[in-house]
Amino acid sequence: GIVMYTTSSLTTTLGFPKDMWIGRSFIDFVHPRDRNTFASQITSGLAVPKIVNGQSPGNPASTMVCRIRRYRGLTTGFGVKDRVVTFMPFLLKFTFKNVSDEEGKVIYLVIQATQFFSAFRIPSEVVSKAVPFVMRHAANGNLEYIDPESVPYLGYLPQDVTDKDALQLYHPEDLDYLQQVYETIVKEGGVPRTKAYRMMAQNGDYLKLETEWSSFINPWSKRLDFVIGKHHIIEGPSNPDVFQSPDPEKAVAMSEEEKAKEQKYRRDIIRTMNEVLTKPAEVAKQQMTKRCQDLASFMESLMEEQQPKVDEDLRLDIQDPDHSYYQRDSVMLGGISPHHDYNDSKSSTGTPLS
């Protein structure tokens, strides 16, 4: 889509001269890695069924996290240093509007961009009121969902880490403890809250957090489908700017023995999630067995209640053969759904543009 209008905050935030975006395509200013996600978001918005005046029911807005290019002449602000082109993270809110002109009604896309800032200001900042965020990964470790609330704390954009190995984010020295945590999750269905452990931010440094764990056990396969973690940040990383690129000079050199040990821990966690017989699975099995037994008992009692009435009908038919007869068919349909509704927290964060 071609940009038709911008607010003055575009200049103060990204440094572009006034009206420089007018007549150009918005996607030209989007980071190349975010363009597919951006295009998909726009396409899905246009595909929503419209009602009167071309508005979606309630005119709902969709959101996504996206990096937008800064003006090359801008010399201040955070971002990746020593690069010709730098980008800044934003939460984009999309709404579609109908505007009537001399050519008729035209649908315009209105984008409200809210800049993300790092949640930390000083190295290893102790955090007391961090906004919790949710991550969900499958039994094979693949990250399936991450909250937008995580962006100021971890620095990752959701599309950068989705379908990646969530276990790679854990500090190698904490994998031993986390293996015990996962064993408890599988056996008990969850963990109320863990001890503090470390997770890697986008800049390569680690922050400390505590997590409330839960899981979903498929009642049909009796296997763990996914694990949900509600994370509470308690201490920031040594580099407070989580949006910076990792410093290769700070990378810790590991011996081959340490690497092998780290890989073994991760394999053991995956095996735990896929092989250990779980208490929740047994509970689900018992619940399903009880439902079947209850259904069978109900059907038996129903048939017993209907039996005297059927006999009376038969006697009436014998006494008065001229009366037409009828049948009573009793049908009961029962269904047990293996699906469990889980609502991912949807919210936005950041400071609105001024």
From Swiss-Prot:
InterPro entries tied to this protein: PAS (IPR000014), PAS-like_dom_sf (IPR035965), Period_circadian_regulator (IPR050760)
Gene: per
PTM text: Phosphorylated with a circadian rhythmicity.
Protein name: Period circadian protein
Compositionally biased region (Polar residues): 345-354
A Gene Ontology cellular-component term: cytoplasm
Principal location listed in the UniProt entry: nucleus
Family annotation (SUPFAM superfamilies): PYP-like sensor domain (PAS domain) (SSF55785)
Subunit structure: Forms a heterodimer with timeless (TIM); the complex then translocates into the nucleus.
Localization per Swiss-Prot or TrEMBL: Nucleus
Any Gene Ontology biological process: negative regulation of transcription by RNA polymerase II
Domain annotation PAS: ranges: 1-55, 133-235
Coiled coil residues, start to end: none
Function noted in UniProt: Involved in the generation of biological rhythms. The biological cycle depends on the rhythmic formation and nuclear localization of the tim-per complex. Light induces the degradation of tim, which promotes elimination of per. Nuclear activity of the heterodimer coordinatively regulates per and tim transcription negative feedback loop. Behaves as a negative element in circadian transcriptional loop. Does not appear to bind DNA, suggesting indirect transcriptional inhibition.
Superkingdom to which the source organism belongs: Eukaryota
CDD domains linked to this entry: PAS
